[in-house]
């Protein structure tokens, strides 16, 4: 766990479509985010630690540390961009090309399938990159962790020289019910998880998962051993429940 004092000169203002308003800093080779609506930093840490026991490569997701920023809870992650690389979100990619808000365009479409196919086609035509496998991994994770804030500014590509590649999966803090205001912790977890609404293509994580299929596996035994060592929190309780709920994502050994 880290403790960092950061002056206001390191505050970075980012525009986007996220409902979150976390204070973000860039200092040295690290990004820092303060908690805002829940224990987002803890969630980022738990999710990235869990993914270490998955079939995803380390380069396919961002690793977060949990700690304190100016004595407030939060997290930090290393900058994943190499020199000369640029992160371009789906939102900005579309706006740069058409001058329109992609989320508003998708809202006009009637079905999840239309929205997904439109975005995949657009990114292919703009970047020459098929993002199907990337989205498959993202929505497998989002279903598992109940991500309530996947949007067009945390789905992204990276411009690397003269070609585009999928960005690593990042920004998972609004998950594990940490900031869901409708949750009642006097109720069982299985009741509270019903209060989750997914994004961005439809309100159901499972529908998006079934559209794409399974994106990765998790070493269930290793995760269970690790998670028991973590501090008892509601977020940990939800993650344990979700791992049991979607135990078909497990693999015996990685």
Predicted regions and their residues:
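Intrinsic structural disorder
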Residues: 1, 129-131, 253-254
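Conserved ATP-binding subdomain of kinase catalytic cores across diverse folds
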Residues: 1-102
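C-terminal catalytic region of ATP-dependent kinase domains
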Residues: 35-39, 162-254
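A broadly tuned "polar low-complexity/structure-edge" signature
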Residues: 38, 47-48, 59, 103-109, ...
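Short C-terminal domain-edge/linker segments immediately following a structured domain
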Residues: 61-64, 107-110, 197-203
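ATP-dependent phospho-/nucleotidyl transfer catalytic cores
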Residues: 80-139, 203, 215, 231, ...
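Conserved kinase catalytic-core segment
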Residues: 112-176
């Amino acid at each position: 766990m880290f403790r960092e004092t950061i002056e206001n000169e390191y505050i970075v203002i980012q525009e986007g479509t996220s409902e979150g308003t976390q204070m973000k800093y860039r200092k040295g080779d690290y990004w820092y985010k303060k908690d805002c609506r829940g224990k987002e930093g803890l969630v980022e840490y738990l999710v990235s630690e869990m993914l270490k026991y998955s079939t995803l490569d380390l380069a396919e997701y961002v690793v977060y540390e949990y700690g304190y920023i100016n004595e407030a809870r939060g997290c930090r992650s290393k900058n994943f961009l190499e020199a000369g690389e640029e992160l371009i979100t789906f939102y900005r990619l579309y706006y740069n090309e058409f001058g329109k808000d992609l989320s508003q365009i998708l809202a006009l479409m009637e079905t999840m399938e239309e929205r997904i196919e439109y975005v995949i086609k657009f990114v292919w035509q703009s970047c020459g990159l098929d993002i199907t496998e990337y989205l498959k991994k993202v929505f497998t994770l989002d279903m598992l962790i109940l991500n309530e804030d996947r949007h067009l500014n945390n789905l992204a590509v990276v411009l690397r020289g003269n070609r585009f590649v999928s960005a690593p999966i990042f920004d998972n803090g609004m998950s594990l019910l940490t900031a869901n205001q409708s949750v009642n912790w006097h109720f069982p977890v299985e009741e509270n998880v019903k209060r989750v609404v997914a994004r961005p293509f439809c309100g159901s994580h499972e529908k998006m998962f079934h559209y794409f299929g399974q994106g990765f596996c998790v070493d269930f035994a290793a995760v269970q051993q690790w998670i028991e060592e973590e501090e008892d929190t509601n977020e940990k309780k939800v993650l344990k429940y979700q791992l049991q709920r979607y135990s078909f994502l497990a693999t015996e050994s990685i």
